[in-house]
Structure formats: structure tokens, C-alpha cells
């Protein structure tokens, strides 16, 4: 991928949602909700603070994250779909 986000933006690849319910029923693609978790693919160089210095981001490439339902902007690059969002849209980092 040849995308480099600017400032405090990050690029996220959604993690696939559940294919079936807890009861064992398969969920068709049209009924699935888009997952609200993903993997960070790329990060910007940081956000400028009050002193004009660039503060590094808390999230790193490879982090699994949770984000809000309406967070980010969907972009398509080379046939792959990604979300571009600000670090402020990230709700939590999933610890492994």
C-alpha cells in the first residue's frame, strides 16, 4: 500500500465480523453490521501541540483498535477498502 497519512490521521483495515450468530445461524452479507474494530495499517507523524512541536501518536502500526460506528472515511486503494480516521476517533487499543 502506498498511502501515508498526514498529521494525526491513521489508516485502519477493518477486521471481519462474525459469520454466524451464537445460535449457529449464518448471517448474510446484507444483514451484517460493519465491524467496529480493525488493525492499524499506517500512522501519521503526529499532532502539533501548543508549542508547535509534533507529539507522536499513541497508536502504532499493527495495533488492534476499537472505534465508533461512524468514525472515519472509507477509502478504496488497489481494490482494498480502508478507513482513514483521526486518532481521536479511536476508543481503545485491544491488548493481546
From Swiss-Prot:
Keyword Glycoprotein in record: no
Keywords of the record: Chaperone, Cytoplasm
Gene Ontology terms describing biological process: chaperone cofactor-dependent protein refolding
Keyword Cytoplasm attributed: yes
HAMAP family named in the record: CH10
Subunit structure of this chain's protein: Heptamer of 7 subunits arranged in a ring. Interacts with the chaperonin GroEL.
Protein name: Co-chaperonin GroES
Provenance organism: Trichlorobacter lovleyi (strain ATCC BAA-1151 / DSM 17278 / SZ) (Geobacter lovleyi)
Phylogenetic placement of the source organism: Bacteria, Pseudomonadati, Thermodesulfobacteriota, Desulfuromonadia, Geobacterales
Originating gene: groES
Amino acid at each position: 500500500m502506498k498511502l501515508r497519512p498526514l498529521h494525526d490521521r491513521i489508516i485502519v483495515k477493518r477486521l471481519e465480523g462474525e459469520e454466524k450468530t451464537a445460535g449457529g445461524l449464518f448471517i448474510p452479507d446484507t444483514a451484517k453490521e460493519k465491524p467496529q474494530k480493525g488493525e492499524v495499517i499506517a500512522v501519521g507523524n503526529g499532532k502539533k501541540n501548543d508549542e508547535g512541536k509534533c507529539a507522536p501518536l499513541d497508536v502504532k502500526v499493527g495495533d488492534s483498535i476499537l472505534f465508533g460506528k461512524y468514525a472515519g472515511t472509507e477509502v478504496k486503494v488497489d481494490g482494498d477498502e480502508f478507513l482513514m480516521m483521526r486518532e481521536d476517533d479511536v476508543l481503545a487499543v485491544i491488548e493481546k
